[in-house]
Amino acid sequence: MSGNTFGKLFTVTTFGESHGLALGAIIDGCPPGIELSEEDLQLDLDRRKPGTSRYTTQRKEADQVKILSGVFEGKTTGTPIGLLIENTDQRSKDYGKIKDQFRPAHADYTYMQKYGIRDYRGGGRSSARETAMRVAAGAVAKKVLANLWGIKIRGYLSQLGPIKAELLDWNEVEQNPFFCPDKSKVPEMEAYMQALNKEGNSVGAKITVVAENMIPGLGEPVFDRIDADLAHALMGINAVKGVEIGAGFACVAQKGTEHRDEITPEGFKSNQAGGVLGGISTGQDLIASLALKPTSSLRIPGQSVDIEGNPVEVITTGRHDPCVGIRATPIAEAMMALVILDHALRNRGQNGHVQSGVPIIPGSIPGQIGS
């Protein structure tokens, strides 16, 4: 398995399985002198961890992160940062009945075909449990971006099943278990999830992430465009089946006069492009959305085959998220942070001396609301 490292200058390598002893990460390329503590990382880990509400998996993991190296007297040293989170609430017996079966729409079948062996306990390495280390590493990246460039990254749930939520109030996002920015939609989401739990079914979701106070010039055309790398990062999250930058697929129905982001000396008049032109950041908010499929670990029987190719009926009795998108917001934020920091360091290395002489256009016209 060779796909466990992300980034070029700011790199993150993760290891560990869902029911193994621990999860870990090695971060390399972190600038020195940044104040960093375990508490800084724990804030985002607590936002992601399981068992925090009745609408997520009831697996109880403290997700207490330990910084093993790379930090001295409260500051990064520039050497590799080692991170570790112990698994404490594995219940592998839940998976005994399906160890020789392939759960529909899971990685069971493909892992077995590729490697000839798989850890069936909770999905092993393919489990979303692995994303705890992405969130921890992303918290480091967030801290560096805020300190060196003033960039802030945050996200929200923009759709749960058929229920759409507009970005009305950032302050509401952390006040409910859904990361929903529209307070009026929360009761509807609660009722929907309660009905879903009774049914034993699951549903998908859409998450939107935004990087504010962006700087222009990040992105390496032609193959390492910042939007291409961002799409790569977000598609690498478990259960993600689609990514949009800015207007995304809605641009198909737009006319050129609607989609073009006109520029004035006072600022950009809109942000249909999502803060990227030609694969390079414009300095506007960098905006991406991702679609997450419904989990197929269900109490409702489903058809599949066993390792010998015989037909079987699969029922999954483990502890699973009825909507994996509910806990995906901090994961998406983390992946966006990793991409932006990697590109910021690459840009500083090659183009840090460049002075274009072109005035920096504000991200939007002062007082303008909307896209």
From Swiss-Prot:
One Gene Ontology biological process: amino acid biosynthetic process
Pathways per UniProt: Metabolic intermediate biosynthesis; chorismate biosynthesis; chorismate from D-erythrose 4-phosphate and phosphoenolpyruvate: step 7/7
Function comment: This reaction introduces a second double bond into the aromatic ring system.
Co-factor: note: Reduced FMN (FMNH(2)).
Identification of the protein by name: Chorismate synthase
Keyword Flavoprotein listed: yes
Gene Ontology molecular function terms on file: chorismate synthase activity; FMN binding
Record-listed NADP(+) binding positions: R48, R54
Recorded catalytic activity of this chain's protein: 5-O-(1-carboxyvinyl)-3-phosphoshikimate = chorismate + phosphate
One Pfam family cited in the UniProt record for this chain: Chorismate_synt
Gene: aroC
Subunit-level organization: Homotetramer.
PANTHER family, sorted: CHORISMATE SYNTHASE
GO CC terms of this entry: cytosol
Amino-acid positions noted as binding FMN in the UniProt annotation, renumbered to this chain: R125, S126, S127, N238, A239, G278, K293, P294, T295, S296, S297, R319
